[in-house]
């Protein structure tokens, strides 16, 4: 896909992977709309990315349709690429598990994501084209200690991705999941303060590069899943 002039929505675009991806897309000539919960962070992201913004919480399930329609309206009814990047993570031992924590994470990582995508897909079907990028995690590949909530949400997203691939390929809609390993972003920080780059860890720019590469493949093909690891994070 040639990104010049394409309409792209990036959820969770005010920080980290979403912000870097939005900037890279704008630099490629795409029309980009980023969503996020904090108007203050979104306003800062505008200066960095050059993207349009809209503030809403993807976990607000009851208003998903209204919020999606606002996004669609800002693009005059055409969406070429949807990047489902908004995500939430917690670490809890088995003894600490609660339904509130499960719902808090799943409402963002699974339920809100799926219902927002549901609103965008009919446009792509009419267009007979489109690309959906789900930002997963290497936590979707193998469980780990204290990962009961977060990892299971990413396992669920991986399954959604595979189901959508089977369902949407006949409509020329490509669905890809990008699974980053540890990235130096604000992810997991309750104050949403971005971490300093560490020389041997992945940064948001590497993940943005992976996302752009998957999108820019000619539409006759697609990458179904891409795992992104730091080369040597062990030192």
Residue ranges and their predicted role:
Residues 14-15:
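Conserved glycine-rich cofactor-binding loop
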Residues 142, 163-173:
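Active-site-adjacent segment of SDR/Rossmann-fold oxidoreductases
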């Amino acid at each position: 896909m040639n990104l010049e002039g394409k309409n792209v929505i990036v959820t969770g675009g005010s920080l980290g992977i979403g912000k870097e991806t939005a900037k890279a897309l704008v630099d490629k000539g795409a029309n980009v709309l980023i969503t996020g919960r904090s108007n203050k962070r979104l306003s800062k992201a505008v200066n960095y990315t050059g993207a349009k913004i809209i503030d809403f919480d993807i976990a607000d399930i009851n208003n998903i349709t209204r919020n999606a329609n606002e996004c669609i309206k800002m693009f005059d009814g055409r969406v070429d690429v949807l990047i489902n990047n908004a995500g939430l993570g917690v670490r809890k031992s088995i003894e600490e598990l609660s339904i509130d924590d499960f719902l808090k994470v799943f409402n963002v990582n699974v339920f809100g994501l799926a219902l927002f995508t549901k609103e965008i897909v009919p446009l792509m079907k009419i267009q007979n084209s489109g690309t959906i990028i789900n930002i997963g995690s290497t936590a979707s590949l193998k469980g780990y200690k204290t990962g009961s909530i977060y990892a299971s949400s990413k396992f669920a997203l991986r399954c959604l991705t595979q189901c959508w691939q089977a369902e949407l390929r006949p409509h020329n809609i490509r669905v890809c999941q990008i699974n980053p390993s540890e990235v130096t972003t604000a992810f997991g920080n309750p104050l949403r303060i971005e971490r300093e780059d560490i020389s041997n860890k992945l940064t948001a720019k590497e993940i943005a590069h992976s996302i752009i590469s998957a999108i820019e493949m000619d539409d006759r093909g697609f990458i179904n899943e891409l795992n992104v690891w730091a080369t040597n994070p062990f030192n």
